[in-house]
Design a protein with these regions (language model features):
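Sec-dependent N-terminal signal peptides
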Residues: 4-14
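Residues on the lipid-exposed face of transmembrane beta-strands in outer-membrane beta-barrel proteins
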Residues: 34-36, 64-68, 78, 106-112, ...
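Short glycine/proline- and aromatic-enriched beta-strand/turn motifs that initiate or cap beta-hairpins
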Residues: 21-68, 195-199, 204
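Sec/Tat signal peptide C-region and signal peptidase I cleavage site
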Residues: 16-20
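Residues that define the transmembrane beta-barrel architecture of outer-membrane proteins
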Residues: 28-30, 56-62, 100-106, 120, ...
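Gram-negative (and chloroplast) outer-membrane scaffold detector with strong preference
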Residues: 40, 60-141
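Extracellular loop and loop/strand-boundary signature of outer-membrane beta-barrel proteins
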Residues: 48-52, 92-99, 150-155, 177-179
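Repeated loop/turn-to-beta-strand initiation elements of outer-membrane beta-barrel proteins
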Residues: 72-76, 118-120, 173-178, 200-204
Length: 204
């Protein structure tokens, strides 16, 4: 609960200057974004009772978002994230197992455009939702080491998901733009991608 309150307070702090903005230039009613994020929060969610996997061959989040702009400043939408990773576990340099794990996330988000120019857009975003994950254990050698794996019950594999992006930048045209954002959550600490906006014909 404290985490949700902190996210809300931070969002309001970033949103206040945006509400005073009136001379926005770029605005699409519907926007789609596709990105890749480095080090999503699912990659460091391990808690007490779970084993630590010191070697990670690969991790990162691939995500897609849809945003419906209520105004030129405020947009709401949904985000889907897919986070595959391969982890190796060893004891004293002796390989024990290889773990293929994936996370699947659905979040609803609020996006605030607090600076708009013809070719550059700055924004902040916050999202909350749920995450589920699964895993597949391969190359396991139980004779060397016994591993207490997480529960296979679906209800035990559901967790809280979030994304807080204090700063993001889009560079391009009203319809096509690349973006870079810095934040914390399921979209990664640093992420890059592409944004496509559907231009309203009646506004052209």
């Amino acid at each position: 609960m404290k985490k949700q309150i902190v996210l809300l307070v931070l969002l309001v702090a970033f949103a206040l200057p945006a509400f005073a903005q009136r001379d926005t230039i770029r605005s699409n009613k519907n926007e789609f974004s596709f990105g890749y994020g480095y080090m999503p929060s699912s990659s460091f969610r391990w808690g007490g009772g779970l084993h630590y996997y010191p070697e990670m061959d690969y991790f990162g989040s691939f995500y897609a978002t849809y945003t419906n702009r209520l105004t030129k400043v405020i947009g709401i939408g949904a985000t889907y994230c897919f986070d595959p990773r391969i982890l190796n576990y060893s004891e004293k340099n002796q390989p024990i197992c290889r773990l293929n794990e994936s996370s699947y996330t659905l979040m609803f988000h609020l996006k605030i455009n607090w600076l708009n120019t013809k070719y550059v857009n700055l924004y902040s975003k916050v999202g909350q939702g749920i995450m589920t994950w699964n895993y597949h254990l391969i190359e396991y050698q139980p004779s060397l080491y016994q591993i207490n794996m997480p529960s296979n019950d679906f209800i035990d594999r559901i967790d809280y998901a979030y994304q807080f992006t204090p700063i993001g930048i889009e560079v391009g045209t009203k319809q096509y733009a690349g973006f870079l954002q810095i934040g914390l959550g399921m979209e990664g600490m640093i992420s890059i991608g592409f944004r496509y906006g559907i231009i309203d014909i009646d506004k052209e």
